[in-house]
Amino acid sequence: MPKLTLPKLDDVIAIDIHTHAEEPCGLHGDDGYDDFQERMAEYFKSPNKHPPTVQETAAYYRAKKIAAVIFPVDAERETGFRRYNNTEMLQIAAQNSDVLIPFVSIDPHKGKLGVREAKRLIEEFGVKGFKFHPTMQGFYANDRMAYPLYEAINDGGAIALFHTGQTGVGSGMPGGM
């Protein structure tokens, strides 16, 4: 796959910098992800039981002439939900490069494996950013365990985006997530 291209700013009226990349419903088998999404939809009063796919998200933003920074969240270790493969998400986003600006996500707990993946994604795809969700990923942003991954991101010229503050994720569910 060639390096990622970015939307032409003259073709959009705004950029949404916080858009989640979700897989189609049913791909997670019995790991609880679809039930989790259904409960999230109830909490946030969404008319949909599952968030839109990357393709549906692109179509929505394209119709509104808005670009979107889109990313998965690798919270596999903490939640037990299979993560959305970064490479697969990048390939779908590349097909919609007129409106999607893809970031990727790597759980800092992956250690050296995560560092290697970050370097590969930057070198092969030209990834510009990485999304972290400390609550969902079960770490503190200042945990030294994450520093090698941050260094790889910085050395590759990419940025890190952190979810901060309160989160609705897990609200109203057993254990609150």
Place the predicted regions along the sequence by residue.
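Helix-coil boundary/capping segments in enzymes
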Residues: M1-M177
